[in-house]
């Protein structure tokens, strides 16, 4: 069968059935292609998308050395570790590690993640309950945050005063797929791919899918002989793009808060920014309506707007 005669999915559905959870369906695909794409996308999302997470925890400057130690709160040491580990975090593009610190003293109170002291470039994207502090004795909890890709098992349980944790860096917390039968005309030997994705909120499901597809595409570029199937490939040429879109977002002269929000979600170029919708930006850590209004005004001065589709945008800039 000639390459140009292969079916491509024309019926694409997106069902955001819960917060940070979306089901995508693609039909119709040639028999076997559904499984090939589904498996590749699943593995890439779970193990090849970069992110940040808590990798170690120190309590009372390393004086708490066992899960059985008594601390001044209703929760056990193990409970504290699990609660802090569950934090969804991001690090700015130019920051590799960060620290989350809780210093508790005084009267009893319930402690949530919003009360943490954060190192520069670090953000917590969702509120999480940490502990019920009983008051009296001081309690200090320090968590180290690192960037990484995929899964990294802890080499030890406890070392140098720190509880070491298995690290799951990918913002995709669940991904699975199912292949169903599809039909086009008289052909019934086709695939329908249903892809179910859940994220921790640091990226939305559509962005996670786009990142995975782009990574696979870039890997295949090194394998495919361009000359042989040139008719079926569109090669993006930066010369065909408005040069303003290739400029860095710093040239918009945004406030520090807005700039840091864009860095946190890895938006570097104006062209990357204009392809985002208002809703996508508002989901970014610490991004509010003031930042949104500022960005819209700056783009308007250049004759640009959010939600713009750039068909020939290069994926490898």
UniProtKB/Swiss-Prot annotation:
Q: Which GO terms describe its molecular function?
A: DNA binding; DNA-directed RNA polymerase activity; protein dimerization activity
Catalytic reactions of this protein = RNA(n) + a ribonucleoside 5'-triphosphate = RNA(n+1) + diphosphate
Key words of the record: DNA-directed RNA polymerase, Nucleotidyltransferase, Transcription, Transferase
Give the GO terms filed under biological process for this record. DNA-templated transcription
> What is its biological role?
DNA-dependent RNA polymerase catalyzes the transcription of DNA into RNA using the four ribonucleoside triphosphates as substrates.
Q: What is known of its domains?
A: The N-terminal domain is essential for RNAP assembly and basal transcription, whereas the C-terminal domain is involved in interaction with transcriptional regulators and with upstream promoter elements.
Q: What is this protein called in UniProt?
A: DNA-directed RNA polymerase subunit alpha 2
